[in-house]
């Protein structure tokens, strides 16, 4: 393994092997897991139309294609908007007892979205309890039909 920090664990979280697992590192697109978890916890209808997509399709695009714009829109359409979404993400992190994980934006583009390999295991374990995330993790490609609205003047 050539990664600077890593951790191998059983499904139950038992660590098999690791190196520098408690070092804080930028987590890039893994951020999208926390964004989607937070959006799903808000219990907004998955079939709500947001621009040309449903909320479920935006979740799929964020997870399967790692689409930054989809993650951003999901956060913007969170109850209370973007700011409340980021607050809710960090509240979820605190509930999980994660002290080294910090998120400042929903896509993973910021190097200031950070965590450790040890804390990421807990995030992945939580993510595995959401059927929508499990479904997306088993999917390598998606086909989404864009809906175009006709506007009359």
Whereabouts are the PLM-identified features?
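Active-site SXXK
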Residues: 6, 12-13, 24-50, 120
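Penicillin-recognizing serine hydrolase domain
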Residues: 1-5, 9, 80-153
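Active-site-proximal beta-strand/loop segments in catalytic clefts of secreted hydrolases
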Residues: 9-11, 20, 62-67, 74-75, ...
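Short, well-structured active-site flanking segments
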Residues: 41-53, 130-140
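Conserved catalytic neighborhood of penicillin-recognizing serine enzymes
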Residues: 47-78, 150-153
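A glycine-rich, coil/turn loop motif that links secondary-structure elements
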Residues: 21-26, 51-52, 106-114
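Extracytoplasmic/secreted envelope proteins and their assembly/folding machinery
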Residues: 31, 36, 55-60, 71-75, ...
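A structural microfeature
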Residues: 16-17
């Amino acid at each position: 393994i050539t990664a600077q920090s890593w951790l191998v664990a059983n499904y139950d979280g038992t660590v098999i092997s690791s190196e520098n697992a408690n070092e804080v590192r930028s987590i890039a697109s893994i951020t999208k897991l926390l964004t989607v978890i937070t959006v799903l916890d808000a219990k907004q209808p998955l079939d709500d139309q947001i621009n040309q997509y449903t909320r479920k399709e935006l979740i799929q695009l964020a997870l399967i294609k790692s689409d930054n714009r989809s993650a951003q829109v999901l956060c913007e359409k969170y109850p209370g908007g973007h700011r409340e979404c980021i607050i809710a993400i960090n509240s979820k992190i605190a509930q999980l007892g994660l002290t080294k994980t910090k998120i400042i934006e929903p896509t993973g583009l910021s190097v200031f979205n950070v965590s450790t390999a040890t804390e990421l295991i807990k995030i992945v374990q939580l993510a595995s309890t959401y059927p929508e995330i499990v479904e997306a993790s088993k999917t390598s490609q998606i086909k989404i039909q864009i809906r175009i609205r006709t506007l009359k003047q």
